[in-house]
């Protein structure tokens, strides 16, 4: 099993190029199911979840015409098997995103209930209830969602809670429904906007993406298109947080500052100096960070996917911070691993109280999920001595060659078998 070996203490300098966003690329790949025409996706990150999704689409009947680095050309002219098996879905919960497009395009879908990260319950009931409201007949049989429908009908759907994948699934399904669909309490994430832009490029009629009310007027068919996936705002935030913790001067390219307003604000609170341009962000940090308290919430508030990285930073900050997680239960599993590095953290329910100390000490730690992996890397970069991060297969689900990018910025980090 592969591990990362990190020798802490180096400042990070130079330039890092940001990859396409996994959480934008996955629904965009699924959007290829909505048209019989050729569909091209650019700026695809090279990640395990992307490879898994492409394999799933091939099983469904999509032909991968080209799969060059960063680009995939897809043809869903013949969907022969509208099924996502448990073996395929169990490692990637985003596979649920084929449900809406398959049902809208073929009138049927047989989808295993999803797996993915072990960070708490992420129910798909909002997907199912929304599709049922559009006229689908859906049942749960032996761990599978069995869905059938004629042409879906537009309707008003008020979601009980904010769900990104639920919003994306229903938005895709509604593009081919008869009439108008109104999604209320919709997710506002930039990845939802990116998917809407992709669908509009295919001929969909969508208004309001980026707000909590999205209106979709169904059309008879969608056509082929080419779409460039947005930059990964979480990868961007992860590297910025690493520099704020370690110190240094880094410029991130091929990224967007406008998707990270709250994160950038919190980094400025730590004492970092930040400059931004149209497609770049520069962060400079010359001293020990100040602590930042935060509360995760749906976009545009502080993202849950950045909570763990900020906990690593707060572990060595000059003071005490309070961090509250409101999105997922069980998303403090990295706390016990940080404590192995001598971090001073107490967890009370969904809140962690972090008392910053001047220096973490290197040790062997184990990654429990994707963002916890990034947290432990940042902690290892600031720790004294050697840190070994085990179970890094989580990393390859969401970060493209993170150790190489950090190494080119001066980090002493390498992957070993």
From Swiss-Prot:
The active site is at 117 (proton donor). Disulfide bonds: none annotated. It catalyses: phosphoenolpyruvate + UDP-N-acetyl-alpha-D-glucosamine = UDP-N-acetyl-3-O-(1-carboxyvinyl)-alpha-D-glucosamine + phosphate. The keyword Cell division applies. One of its GO terms (cellular component) is cytoplasm. UDP-N-acetyl-alpha-D-glucosamine binds at residues 93, 122-126, 305, 327. Its EC number is 2.5.1.7. CDD domains: UdpNAET. Phosphoenolpyruvate binds at residues 22-23. Keywords: Cell cycle, Cell division, Cell shape, Cell wall biogenesis/degradation, Cytoplasm, Peptidoglycan synthesis, Pyruvate, Transferase. The keyword Cell division applies. The modification 2-(S-cysteinyl)pyruvic acid O-phosphothioketal is found at residue 117. It is found in: Cytoplasm. Pathway: Cell wall biogenesis; peptidoglycan biosynthesis. One of its GO terms (biological process) is regulation of cell shape. GO terms for molecular function: UDP-N-acetylglucosamine 1-carboxyvinyltransferase activity. Cell wall formation. Adds enolpyruvyl to UDP-N-acetylglucosamine. Belongs to the EPSP synthase family. MurA subfamily. PANTHER family: UDP-N-ACETYLGLUCOSAMINE 1-CARBOXYVINYLTRANSFERASE. This is UDP-N-acetylglucosamine 1-carboxyvinyltransferase. The lineage of its organism: Bacteria, Pseudomonadati, Pseudomonadota, Betaproteobacteria, Nitrosomonadales. The gene is murA.
